[in-house]
Amino acid sequence: MERIIMHYDMDAFYASIEINRNPKLKNKPLVVGENIVTTASYEARKYGIHSAMKVSDAKLLCPKLIAIPVDKKEYIRISNEIHNLILKITNKVEFIATDEGYIDLTGIVKPENKKQFALKFKERIKELTNLTCSVGIGFNKLSAKIASDINKPFGIYIFENEKDFIEYISDKKIKIIPGVGRKFSEILKHDKIFLVKDVFKYSLDYLVKKYGKSRGENLYCSVRGINHDEVEYEREIHSIGNEETYSIPLQTTSELEREFNSLFEYTYQRLIKNNVFSQSITVKIRYTSFKTYTKSKKLKFATKDKDFLYNEMLELLNSFELEDEIRLLGIYFGDIKRSRLVQLTLNKDL
């Protein structure tokens, strides 16, 4: 059966939420973030402003730029509304961030109805949130991801097959390939790889030897539309977790605590959404040196008590002896149970 994979991506998610809350901000250059830009409105992007840029640098490009503090709690609330809507359609969905995800439509939508479904999906999100999203549909996750970025904002693009995909991307800059960031792109330029089609002259063996197994295989396969990754939806749930990688590493304890609170809230809402209980917790950190550490704790009972889980997980986080800037933070609820009988309420004597 032909695979039908859809990728949705909310348009300038944080900035669009702030414009919704204050319509006077519409059509004005706006960024969300006090020190670092997390999201730039489309008006701000016209000045060359982008995420991960220092707000002070952004204001040099646009002196009239408006900077608004991050309100992760509100963004997560709206993200959960979107997730709940999608889960009413199918559980074959992989939420990869608050503002994007993959949906496996194979067997749900007929091939001839792909565009009609995408249009209805976008409109339903707009009705629910007054926000727009862009949708890409392809024959695998790679093609769907690239497709969703083509007609932003509020756009749709569909790749019917590998031939269609290769014809489109061949003349595009190599950075269109997921995993080819700014630094890797510069390395490729030194080797005279500027466009996607420049990769075709090299063998898989050469690319792996030159750039390493992971990067080499990704280049070779991606330019050919080859990607067999499954949409990793939750079947039988054993753990619920999330990780966040920071393009600007966390440097202070206050930054770490802020991001921990946000990540905990998002992950806890997934626990509640699935109506399950956790009896173990894990915290993971990765430094800029790429040293990675995890700490776990087995709880005496399975619970979904928010305050209890938060305090236990915060205690785990505080037990790390921080030795460097942090580029990744992850938290996980494990040993998942569905029965309420194993939970002891904290309002009773234990």
Regions found by a protein language model. Name each.
Residues 137, 331-333:
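Hydrophobic/anchoring residues in structured secondary elements
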Residues 1-216, 339-343, 347-350:
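Gly/Gly-Pro- and Ser/Thr-rich, intrinsically disordered tail segments characteristic of DNA damage-repair
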Residues 7, 189-328, 335-343, 347-349:
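DNA-contacting surface of Y-family translesion DNA polymerases
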